[in-house]
Amino acid sequence: MSTTTLGIIGTGMVGVGVARRAVDAGLAVVLSNSRGPATLADLVADLGERARAATPAEAAEAGDLVLASVPLAAHERLPRAELAGKTVIDPMNYAPKPEWRVPELDDDELTSSELVQRHLAQSRVVKALHSIGPKQLLNLFRPAGAPDRTAVPLSGDDPAAKSEVAEFLDILGFDTVDLGSLADSWLSGPNTPLYALPYTGQPPAGLTPMEFVAWVQQSPGVPASAARVRELAAATVRGPAGFQL
């Protein structure tokens, strides 16, 4: 196992969910956020002896693999120097807002992960853990070979980095489906058949956008096989970039 320590930059729902699963799977985690290590004391105590708090730069340096779970709008604050030479998992999704839009994403000139890779030019970015929610991540893991093991998509430009992330996800309890390059990562982005719903099932009818988000965050999850992920990817047609609730 090449990954023994996971660096995590960002401790929102995704970062914390992945940290919990990683610790339970036997990995060490180094957590960081924009507010400082002292603000993570309770979380670290809850996670136990395999977890510690640090600054983003320290987490980047410590991780054999690094999860950059910050809002996409904050991706340019990721520590480039400390992440140089590292494989970086990108679970970020584009959520355009009146105060923050990216024309290159709106026009499909780039995917959000290509934007991240442009900032982290000396790192190996792999898109993963962006289409399954933290609740489902903590409920759907299974041992290798289990008939109901769930698969998640990944994309990246570096084959070795994709293999590294696939190994990590296997440790967490998931199979993977390689969808291609970062330019292909839109196949599993927001508003595609591969985003969220394969892992939650169909929501109740008549939900408002906010009710839908709350429902997704609480759904215990349903397994999605590698064959199902491939089937959905093959049928995906590109639509508008970013969340369109």
Give each language-model segment a name.
Residues 17, 21, 119, 168:
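Rossmann-fold NAD(P)-dependent oxidoreductase module
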Residues 53, 124-128, 177-179:
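General beta-strand structural signal in soluble alpha/beta enzymes
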Residues 1-46:
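NAD(P)+-binding Rossmann beta1-loop-alpha1 motif at the extreme N-terminus of oxidoreductases
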Residues 3, 62, 85, 122-125:
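A glycine-biased structural micro-motif
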Residues 80-85, 120-121, 144-146:
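Short, conserved loop/helix-junction motifs that constitute active-site signature segments
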Residues 92-142:
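Rossmann-fold NAD(P)-binding glycine/threonine-rich loop
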Residues 48-100:
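Rossmann-like NAD(P)-binding element
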Residues 147-245:
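Active-site-lining helix/loop region of Rossmann-like oxidoreductase modules
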